[in-house]
Structures are given as C-alpha cells and as structure tokens.
C-alpha cells in the first residue's frame, strides 16, 4: 500500500464518461491515479489535467482489457498495491444476440466480467494484508431488472451478484466493496453502442458528477449497493416488489428491450 505518500486509485475506463468523473473526483480528494484504457492520447490528456488542477500524478496503462495480455499488465500493477480500484470499463452493443458478432460478444464478456473478476482478485490480497482498501465495481440498473437486453444485462447482473457476495466474505477485513448501479448517464456509452436515446425522457438522465458523488458517499456510508438518483431507487425497489413476469413486460415495453445485446 502507499500510505506514506498520497493514496493511489487505479481506474479502468477513465478516457471518457463515468471513469473520467471518478478520476477527477479522486484526484480532488488527494489520490494519485493509475489510468487504464485503450485510448492513450485521452489518458495522457487526463493525466496532464489532473496534474495541473489537483497536483495528482498519474501512471498511464494503455491496454485493451478484452485481451489476456492487457488484463495481465493491470493485474501485475495491482499486485504491487493500490488503495482503491474502480472497475468501470465496460460497453453495450446493439442488434439481436443471434445476429451479433460472436467475437464482439466475447470481448464484451471479457471487459464487463472477466476483467472485473481478475482485477478484483489481484487487488485484494494487498488490501486485506493492509486491513483497508476500497473497490467500486460499476454495474448498472440493467443488472437489477429483468427483460432489458441480454448479454449486457447479464454481465451487469454478474457484477452485482459477485460484489454483494464478496462484501459478505470481506466483512471484518477493513476492505470495502460496492456495486454501483447507475441508470442512464450522459456519457459516450450509448453513441458507442449505437443505441438511439432520443426518446428517453429527461427525468431518466443522470450526470456523471451525480453518479460519482453518490458512489463515494455510499462507500463512506458502508452501502454495498449504490443506486444514484431517486427515480432509479424507486424503480429498483419496484422491480423487487412487482412480479418478475410483469417487470419483464414493462421493461420490454418502456425500455425498448429488443435490439439490445
Ligand atoms: N452511460 C450509462 O448510461 C451507463 C449506465 C449504467 C452503467 N454504465 C456503465 O458505466 C461504465 C462506464 O461507461 P460510460 O457510461 O462512462 O461509457 P463511456 O463514456 O463509453 O466509457 C467507457 C470506458 O470504458 C473503456 N473501455 C471500453 N472498452 C475497453 C477495453 N476493451 N479495454 C479498456 N477499456 C475499455 C473506454 O476506454 P477506451 O475506449 O479508451 O478503451 C472508456 O473509457 C460501463 O461499465 C458501463 O456499462 C453506464
């Protein structure tokens, strides 16, 4: 661990969106960063910004988390110890499961699930030895509600279930874990996935700062499942209380459940 100096947070996917929001918020709280994504130019620009605005130092790891080598490089860095890990990199796709490119589906599973598993496994031993550390795994409300897309929702359900199970196992170790479950957030996500969001009502949109602020406050409060926004807290609660076949129908009708993987 790095307690003698500034604490260090490793964030996957900070080249845009929620990950960039975590990087700015944590740099503002005094962390140095390890920035992990494919777009080196974006990571270098962020590192410069974090240095100028907050005096934070950043290591840049420009790797593809869909590859074995990419994940191995991050695992090796985590084994040397970090104070916080934010498993945020992830993506969705459009089209139906049965016509989607199998290679793309596999890389989605590798980024959204395998990387979360391997990076968490790599970070924990040093944290447990130190008796402290934080891991935020970015899931989605899509992982809480049935009937909204297939592989993306399944990947996020894995992240929720994995993180909640892990929280039980880590009780008493001093290490905190959180499954962050945002609804729609204004980032590059939907454009990259090719998802048309033009008919999504304003009330369903969250902004990155709100999501990051809620996550960090919930971490301090010891909440394992963090759901930013009152509208999504209500939806998630309703999703547990209403019969699941009705939830499936509603999410397919109002959530445009077809054409998603
Ligand atoms: N936006 C939403 O409505 C929403 C809602 C719920 C949950 N989420 C989740 O929030 C997380 C962040 O998404 P976002 O909304 O901030 O989207 P975004 O702006 O598209 O950012 C995604 C990040 O993931 C990184 N990434 C994607 N594939 C990668 C790969 N193969 N290797 C390494 N990094 C990779 C991207 O970096 P590079 O392209 O540089 O590699 C980028 O930094 C995701 O896990 C997403 O599922 C988003």
Predicted regions and their residues:
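Conserved glycine-rich cofactor-binding loop
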Residues: 15-17
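Conserved glycine-rich Rossmann-like NAD(P)H-binding loop of the short-chain dehydrogenase/reductase
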Residues: 29-46
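Conserved NAD(P)H cofactor-binding loop of Rossmann-fold oxidoreductase domains
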Residues: 88-93
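Substrate-binding pocket helix/loop in short-chain dehydrogenase/reductase
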Residues: 96-107
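Active-site helix of classical SDR
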Residues: 120, 155
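Residue(s) in the substrate-gating loop at a strand-loop-helix junction
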Residues: 140
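C-terminal helical subdomain
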Residues: 179, 199-235
């Amino acid at each position: 661990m790095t307690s003698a100096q500034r604490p260090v947070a490793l964030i996957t996917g900070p080249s845009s969106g929620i990950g960039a929001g975590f990087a700015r918020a944590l740099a503002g709280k005094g962390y140095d960063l390890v920035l992990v994504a494919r777009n080196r130019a974006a990571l270098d620009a962020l590192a410069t910004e974090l240095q100028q605005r907050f005096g934070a130092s950043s290591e840049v790891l420009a790797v593809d988390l869909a590859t074995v080598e990419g994940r191995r490089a991050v695992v090796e860095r985590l084994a040397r110890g970090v104070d916080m890990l934010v498993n945020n990199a992830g993506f969705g796709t459009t089209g139906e499961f049965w016509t989607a490119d199998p290679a793309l589906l596999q890389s989605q599973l590798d980024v959204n699930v395998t990387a979360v598993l391997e990076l968490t496994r790599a970070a924990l031993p040093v944290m447990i030895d130190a008796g402290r550390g934080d891991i935020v795994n970015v899931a989605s409300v899509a992982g809480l509600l049935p009937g909204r897309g297939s592989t993306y929702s399944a990947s996020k359900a894995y992240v929720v279930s994995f993180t909640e199970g892990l929280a039980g196992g880590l009780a008493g170790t001093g290490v905190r874990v959180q499954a962050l479950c945002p609804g729609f957030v204004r980032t590059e996500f939907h454009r990259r996935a090719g998802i048309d969001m033009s008919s999504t009502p304003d009330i369903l949109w969250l902004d990155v700062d709100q999501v990051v602020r809620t996550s960090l406050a919930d971490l301090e409060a010891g909440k394992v499942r963090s759901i930013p926004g009152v509208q999504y807290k209500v939806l998630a609660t309703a999703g547990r209380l209403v019969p699941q076949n009705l939830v499936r129908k509603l999410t397919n009708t109002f959530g445009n459940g077809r054409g998603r993987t």
